[in-house]
């Protein structure tokens, strides 16, 4: 959520920055709401002053024996009380309308974010590693994976399209990847591992920005009988739960940064993705991801963003996977992000790079919703900055390992860093 004080003091400048990311901020509507709010507040203050003044007179009038005048004054106070209740209701209505609108407004892009309308205008930062040149006709991860235990038909039979069953060697490799990622982040990068719920309420999703704007992308869960029925949601990412661990809290500054990680399934309806990536693991309704979240001092957040990108890169380097880093342009950034880097891994069968990690600095956008604060050196409570990043998407990493490390006979070489998590197995072979 944007800072309302910033909106009030720099409306035109905020509107201009939002326009950079394709959002048309209605300044006339904002001005109208602000005028209504100010009018009600002025009326409330005038009524309160009048009530206080008349209340002081009542005692004096009674002391002078002027009972009729005292009663008239008491009647005035009673009417003012009624008027104040109405003014409070009017102010609450204006504030609710303003708050609901603010929840739908995206974050302001950082000044360093390149301008652009969509993904075609993202900017490449660097490429790392050289895509392998194969001397045989390569297969995609579907043809490689099915003989090793990747079962798309089984997933569809159980749950419908975009679900997958893994068994045997593929299931073990998938698990090994997640464990390797967690160990790297906790033992080398200093994150604390968490296990968090996979089902959350709407307040939790509102805190990180998925609600109210992106309800159609979420899986709903209903529980209870007719009288106690409640709606909750399957998490689309562990960013939601990890970031919400600091909601409604004041963190001592010496405890910052907080570095949190979790391995979880992620559930997404993929609304609007009909017809995209219908083959294989690239776009699933359920997939695993190892998430990184950092809660930091505001002055450290952009330094931290670069650090988190490096943490995700370390996984790709260890797995010997070619990749590139791109800066998302203003028109392609996520709703809550002020700046985002995507890491894209080379997928040989598609002859292109595909997103495998997204690392974002949300600045204080989420923290304002969450009331996540820290106490600075002067004893003042300030909003923290929150950052999140994939470290990495496990299914897409599996795709990359299968395709980049394949052999002509359909076997898969296991990267050396991953072999301890595979019981020393150096190659997956069709049995």
Swiss-Prot record:
What pathway is this protein a component of? Aminoacyl-tRNA biosynthesis; selenocysteinyl-tRNA(Sec) biosynthesis; L-seryl-tRNA(Sec) from L-serine and tRNA(Sec): step 1/1
Q: Which is an annotated Pfam family here?
A: tRNA-synt_2b
State the GO CC annotations.
Answer: cytoplasm
Q: Where in the cell is it found?
A: Cytoplasm
What broad class of enzyme is this? ligase
Reactions that this protein is recorded to catalyse: tRNA(Ser) + L-serine + ATP = L-seryl-tRNA(Ser) + AMP + diphosphate + H(+); tRNA(Sec) + L-serine + ATP = L-seryl-tRNA(Sec) + AMP + diphosphate + H(+)
Binding-site residues, L-serine: 237-239, 291, 390
Cite the EC number.
Answer: 6.1.1.11
GO molecular function terms noted in the UniProt entry: ATP binding; serine-tRNA ligase activity
Keywords attached to this Swiss-Prot or TrEMBL record, sorted alphabetically, are: Aminoacyl-tRNA synthetase, ATP-binding, Cytoplasm, Ligase, Nucleotide-binding, Protein biosynthesis
The cross-references to SUPFAM superfamilies, in alphabetical order and at most eight, read: Class II aaRS and biotin synthetases, tRNA-binding arm
GO terms, biological process: selenocysteine biosynthetic process; seryl-tRNA aminoacylation
Q: Which residues bind ATP?
A: 268-270, 355-358
Write out the domain note.
Consists of two distinct domains, a catalytic core and a N-terminal extension that is involved in tRNA binding.
- Family that this chain belongs to: Belongs to the class-II aminoacyl-tRNA synthetase family. Type-1 seryl-tRNA synthetase subfamily.
Its quaternary organisation is: Homodimer. The tRNA molecule binds across the dimer.
What's its job?
Catalyzes the attachment of serine to tRNA(Ser). Is also able to aminoacylate tRNA(Sec) with serine, to form the misacylated tRNA L-seryl-tRNA(Sec), which will be further converted into selenocysteinyl-tRNA(Sec).
From the Swiss-Prot or TrEMBL record, give the protein name.
Serine--tRNA ligase
């Amino acid at each position: 959520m944007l800072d309302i004080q910033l909106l009030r003091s720099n409306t035109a400048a905020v509107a201009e920055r939002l326009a950079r990311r394709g959002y048309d901020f209605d300044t006339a509507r904002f001005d109208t709401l602000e005028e209504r709010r100010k009018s009600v507040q002025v009326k409330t203050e005038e009524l309160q002053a009048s009530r206080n003044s008349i209340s002081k007179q009542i005692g004096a009038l009674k002391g002078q024996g002027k009972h009729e005048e005292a009663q008239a004054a008491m009647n005035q106070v009673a009417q003012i009380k009624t008027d104040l209740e109405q003014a409070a209701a009017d102010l609450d209505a204006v504030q609710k309308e303003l708050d609901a609108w603010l929840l739908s407004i995206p974050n302001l892009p950082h000044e360093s974010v390149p301008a652009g309308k969509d993904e075609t205008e993202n900017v490449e930062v660097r490429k790392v590693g050289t895509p392998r040149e194969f001397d045989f006709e390569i297969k995609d991860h579907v043809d490689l994976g099915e003989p090793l235990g990747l079962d798309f038909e089984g997933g569809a039979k159980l749950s419908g399209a975009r679900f997958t069953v893994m068994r045997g060697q593929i299931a073990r490799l998938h698990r090994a990847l997640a464990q390797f990622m967690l160990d790297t982040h906790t033992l080398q990068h200093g994150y604390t591992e968490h296990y968090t719920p996979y089902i959350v309420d709407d307040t939790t999703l509102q805190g990180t920005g998925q609600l109210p704007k992106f309800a159609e992308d979420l899986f709903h869960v209903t529980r209870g009988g007719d009288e106690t029925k409640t709606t909750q949601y399957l998490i689309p990412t562990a960013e939601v739960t990890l970031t919400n661990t600091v909601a409604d809290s004041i963190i001592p500054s010496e405890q910052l940064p907080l570095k949190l990680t979790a391995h979880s399934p992620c559930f997404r309806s993929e609304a609007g993705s009909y017809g995209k990536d219908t083959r294989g693991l690239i776009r699933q309704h359920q997939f695993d991801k190892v998430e990184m979240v950092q809660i930091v001092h505001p002055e450290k957040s952009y330094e931290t963003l670069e650090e988190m990108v490096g943490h995700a890169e370390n996984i790709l380097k260890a797995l010997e996977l070619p990749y590139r880093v791109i800066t998302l342009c203003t028109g392609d950034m996520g709703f809550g992000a002020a700046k985002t880097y995507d890491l894209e891994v080379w997928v040989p069968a598609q002859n292109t790079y595909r997103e495998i990690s997204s690392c974002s600095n949300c600045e204080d956008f989420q923290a304002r919703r969450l009331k996540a604060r820290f106490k600075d050196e002067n004893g003042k409570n300030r909003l923290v900055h929150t950052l999140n990043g994939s470290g990495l998407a496990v299914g897409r990493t599996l795709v990359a390992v299968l395709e980049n490390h394949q052999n002509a006979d359909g076997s898969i070489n296991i990267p050396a860093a991953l072999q301890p998590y595979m019981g020393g197995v150096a190659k997956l072979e069709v049995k």
